[in-house]
Amino acid sequence: MSALCFYFQVHQPYRLRHYTFFDIGVDSFYEDEDANCGIMLKVARKCYLPMNALLLKLIRKYDGRFKVSFSISGTALDQFEAYAPEVIQSFRELVATGCVELLSETYNHSLAFLYSPEEFREQVA
């Protein structure tokens, strides 16, 4: 069997709620908690949990002859912890096989460079 290593980047952004001019000074909650929860539960059920179960099955079937790497953003980890902790457990089970490596990842995927070079430098420094 040829050497094979899969790399998966795991990221879940926070969803923003509709925020109008009239909300300024009245409501400072920018994130849509219902959307964050609903989307996380859906992608956990349809994507993360089935894929991690499949990878675990294949690692066992092929006796660890391939490797998998994950980089998981901080926003994804925060949402897994809040809404779908079983996803974190599924990653732990994969890491325990010795065939899975966790790589460094940024907390979020900022677009600050589009608006402010100074802010971008602050975030990556």
Predicted regions and their residues:
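Metal-dependent polysaccharide deacetylase catalytic core of the NodB/CE4 family, i.e.
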Residues: 68, 72-125
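N-terminal regions that are enriched for targeting/export leaders
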Residues: 1-63, 68, 96
